[in-house]
Amino acid sequence: MASLIGGSAIQHLAQDIDTNKINHKAKANGPNLAPKSRALDMVSKLEPSRGPVHEHWWDLTSPQLASMLEEAGYPVGRQLEILLFYNHTIPEADSSRNWQSLLPVTVVPLEYSWKWDTACESPEVRLTIEAFGDLSGTRADPLNQAAAIELLHRTKGVLPDLNQTWINHFCSTLFDEDKDKYMEEAQSGTGMRLQSTMLVAFEFGRTSTSTKTYLTPRRLGQQGFARLPEYMPAIQALGPSRALDTLMDFLHTSPEGVELTPFGLSFDNVEPTSSRLKFYFASPNTSYNSLREVLTLGCRISKANFNIEEKIRTIHSLAKALMVAPDNLPDDEHISARAQPQSLSSASDPVTSDIVKERTSLLAGYQYYFDIAPGADLPDIRFYAPIRKELINDRGVAAAVTDWMKAQGRGKFCDNYVRMLEGMAGERGLSKCHGLHSFIGCLIRRDGELDVTSYLLPG
């Protein structure tokens, strides 16, 4: 990233900001009323707008990203690098067309994530973009993949380790070649409507940036999400995977496993031997017993160095707080879902209404991913608790997460997190916001520590 304006230039800018050589004046930032970060102020002065769409993205989202980086404790020089990188990767094509977005947003198709600190690591900020181009939704690119691939091509100059081997593999094996037929299907009403099938994520480490690709398979004639057998030839072509074999055994033999529905894949854009391969599933169930069965793969996973049952109990306590369930909920009882009021959904929008219908089964229960990359004996498993915004506002979500983090002895960045959210909420205030949070994810690491991530939508 330093090559955009030169590494030494970034170092000098960071030193100037840190020593207040630059006369900085805080300004209001549109919907985000928090003062501009010093790094954002400098990047905004250095980088001109590249058109109205770019300006819209930058004005809305750059203050939010800058606040996340600042509150997460990134060094100023790294904040500058990331904001410059983001400025140069913002889509320049209009995404406001009549289009089914993969992301549950109406402002810009983007999702942030805040990976919480651990005993050895500070928080990490990430974002996922649904890119659009002039050809998105046309016969040339009916499933909106070209814009995401072009975005990765543009970043390859500053991310030299970027590798698209698995993108090429999965695009050739999970989709049909005849683009005209996708258009004909959608126009005739015999198939699903056109929608994006690819997202790009950027993970901003303390010293480097990495990328990840999300794919949702789409075959001609497909109705709803692709079924498990449609994934298998593409995954198995990558080579033997004991983790995959274990997962398949669980999916076919466990009462909980047979109820899991696949809905996508993601992988790191690196050499395949170093990449994760995450297989995403949705469950209609939300009981403790269900959670335990999945996170242990039906007792196939056990840990000698820590009490896994205790870890799952701790995760379930967070899920109950987020989903507004009683503390004394019996282990075999599910957290009941309630219909979402129209005032908190987009049911009046016919495009978004279709999306809401398709996602109903996903949002009703828990979600999981299983890392099945070749090489591991057992998959790492991440659990996602959906935020039911009809039951809890974002201040309530923030309180649930931060209280839980403090109870785990991990409260160092809790005040920073709330300040960041308050900036995203702006004048409305967190108590009147429903929907900044989309999910909270938890993974039990191999050392027993809980890896926790908040997923956030633009305010």
Swiss-Prot record:
Its EC number is 2.5.1.-. Keywords: Transferase. NCBIfam families: arom_pren_DMATS. It comes from the Eukaryota. Prenyltransferase; part of the gene cluster that mediates the biosynthesis of penigequinolones, potent insecticidal alkaloids that contain a highly modified 10-carbon prenyl group. The first stage is catalyzed by the nonribosomal peptide synthetase penN that condenses anthranilic acid and O-methyl-L-tyrosine to produce 4'-methoxycyclopeptin. 4'-methoxycyclopeptin is then converted to 4'-methoxydehydrocyclopeptin by the ketoglutarate-dependent dioxygenase penM through dehydrogenation to form a double bond between C-alpha and C-beta of the O-methyltyrosine side chain. This is Prenyltransferase penI. Coiled coil: none annotated. CDD domains: PT-DMATS_CymD. InterPro entries: Aro_prenylTrfase, Aro_prenylTrfase_DMATS, DMATS-type_fun. Pathway: Secondary metabolite biosynthesis; Alkaloid biosynthesis; Mycotoxin biosynthesis. GO terms for biological process: alkaloid metabolic process. L-tryptophan binds at V107, V108, E111. It comes from Penicillium thymicola. It holds the Pfam family Trp_DMAT. Belongs to the tryptophan dimethylallyltransferase family. GO terms for molecular function: prenyltransferase activity. Signal peptide: none annotated. Substrate binds at R126, R276, K278, Y280, Y384. It catalyses: quinolinone B + dimethylallyl diphosphate = peniprequinolone + diphosphate.
